[in-house]
Amino acid sequence: MKSKGSRLSTDCPVEFPKIVSGFAEEVKIRRQSSQGQYAVDSHPPKSPELKHRRQRSSSFVNGKCRNRDLPLLDNKKAQEINTNSHGQDIGIKNLPRQRELLNAKNGIDFTLMVAGQSGLGKTTFINSLFSTSLIDDDIKENKPIIRYKSIVEGDGTHLNFNVIDTPGFGNNMDNAFTWRTMVNYIDEEIRSYIFQEEQPDRTKMVDNRVHCCLYFLRPSNKGIDTLDVVTMKKLAKRVNLIPVIAKSDLLTKEELKNFKTQVREIIRVQDIPVCFFFGDEVLNATQDIFQKYPFSIIASNEYIFNEKGEKVKGRQYKWGAVDIENEKYCDFKILQKTIFDWNLIDLVESTEDYYEKCRSEMLRTRLLKARDCLTTKSVDITEEQRKFLEEEMNFDEIEENKLKNYKCYEIINKTVMDKVATEWDPEFITRQLEAKKKFNELSNREISKFRDWKKSLFMEQENFNQEIEQLNHKLENLQLECQDLEYKLLIGKSSNSHSTDSATLVNVHIKR
């Protein structure tokens, strides 16, 4: 039973081995070059591309970079190493061939992401690339990221091929952070692989790291959309980005030429690196990508008959037919060769180098996060763990801790790092800042209202105080008036009493 969004190795069509013929040739070239590095009668490569591949071949083992800085041996030293003191062949020259056979047996993991706005034929392109219905057109899922798995076999070598599709990209009303879904997926696969390597049993490791991203641009005479520019800038820092012009048959030759010039100029001005992980050595030997981007492509799952009567993949129009594999019409075949025939190993190796940098940075971040546990409560730790961090860890000289660092890695596990990644998420930070801004605006409005109310209350209180003072003043006046009246009343009573006493004395005197 097949799961949705994946394909089994038995589903591979007959055309699949042809697609990976370039990868098989790479294995042969590296096998021959490895023998040539140690063999006395080896012949130097004739082409710069073959020389570049020979120099890089010995560094690729099981999809990983190993011993890339080892110098090549000259014929004299090679002869001395291949034989012992008695001149007998000890068989060391066969080791590179055995290693290449082991590499061919184990195969290689390769993940390709197709990104861009909806309606640009990303699904049709993938199906055209492998001449099979790898992605069903009728699958309508609401997931922003869909992964399709397949195993490509050919010439004794197999390729574990993954396709990452991004349906519905750019269809939201607010596309400010639409790119975050793809960026988070790339970062999450890097983190997942780091934690898989820390497990005791690494035989079940799953490598879904994205090695290359084809970004589809809408054909237009007005340049590139802002959404595409922002998204490519974010992706180019995390994956080998290759811009392509979708549905190039909608433009005339002159319009297509001008649009390519506009795209290259915009990419240069916006500082968007193409295949950012490629080193100088690869850049000097690999010029196909950097001379011909953006690639103009036409995709089709239908077969037509060309002018020679041959059955080819193409599109039939009223005015004629277009063979999508004919370089005269588009760069479909060139792009296919660029990815699989010429630069597959470079894409994988450069991604491996980027992964090593991310791994070192992430391990250092986990150690610093463990140090912060002593001063903050961002991570819940036990007293035993706290005692270990305080007494046995030297956070000033991390390298001196040696194996003790793994104790910190156990404390700062994937759950903690996922939480940290969420806290560092640009959309989360932006939403948080927007929420704080709205809160501050609301708070300022409420504070302003409170100040107005306070001012109004103070004014009313002042009016009340004035009224109270006036009433107190009136009360005092009334009290004074009452006192005057009482005084006058007392004086009046006193005078009346004195008059009465005088009259009584007069009457008594008369009687006598």
Swiss-Prot record:
Q: What GO MF annotations does this protein's record show?
A: GTP binding; GTPase activity; molecular adaptor activity; structural molecule activity
**Domain Septin-type G positions:** 106-365
Chain residue ranges for the region called G4 motif: 246-249
Give the span(s) annotated as G1 motif: 116-123
Q: How does it sit in the membrane?
A: Peripheral membrane protein
Cite the Pfam families for this sequence. Answer: Septin
Quaternary state and partners of this protein? Answer: Interacts with other septin proteins such as SPR28 to form a ring at the bud neck.
Functional description taken from the UniProt entry:
Septins are GTPases involved in cytokinesis that assemble into filaments and form a ring at the cleavage site. May act by recruiting MYO1 and HOF1, a protein involved in septation, to the site of cleavage. Septins are also involved in cell morphogenesis, bud site selection, chitin deposition, cell cycle regulation, cell compartmentalization and spore wall formation.
What's the protein name? Answer: Sporulation-regulated protein 3
Query: Which species is the source of this protein?
Result: Saccharomyces cerevisiae (strain ATCC 204508 / S288c)
Q: Which gene encodes it?
A: SPR3
